[in-house]
Curated annotation (Swiss-Prot):
Disulfide bonds: none annotated. The gene is rpsO. InterPro entries: Ribosomal_uS15, Ribosomal_uS15_bac-type, uS15_NS1_RNA-bd_sf. NCBIfam families: S15_bact. One of its GO terms (molecular function) is rRNA binding. Gene3D superfamilies: 6.10.250.3130, S15/NS1, RNA-binding (1.10.287.10). It comes from the Bacteria. It comes from Baumannia cicadellinicola subsp. Homalodisca coagulata. This is Small ribosomal subunit protein uS15.
Length: 89
């Protein structure tokens, strides 16, 4: 249940420094957030899919670690990213 190529390209263009910047922290967090939102829609239909839920928890944990790193590295960009992604932090 990964994101489509076009969705990834749009996220990279929106949050990256250029169209090929898929490795920066902001882009990684945005991609993980999109994948989490996609999986939440999946779980609305498939409530008993516990194997995928474990994968979701792994992705959420990875995003949380990246958010902590990004907050310590660049607070201004962190707050901007949180507002753009509508996260509750």
């Amino acid at each position: 249940m990964s994101l489509s190529f076009n969705t990834k390209a749009k996220i990279i263009a929106d949050f990256g420094r250029n169209n090929y910047d898929s490795g920066s922290t902001a882009v990684q967090i945005a991609l993980l957030t999109a994948q989490i939102n996609h999986l939440q829609d999946h779980f609305a239909v498939h409530k008993k899919d516990h194997h995928s839920r474990r994968g979701l928890l792994r992705i959420v944990s990875q995003r949380r670690k990246l958010l902590v790193y990004f907050k310590n590295k660049d607070l201004a960009s962190y707050t901007d990213l949180i507002e753009r992604l509508n996260l509750r932090r």
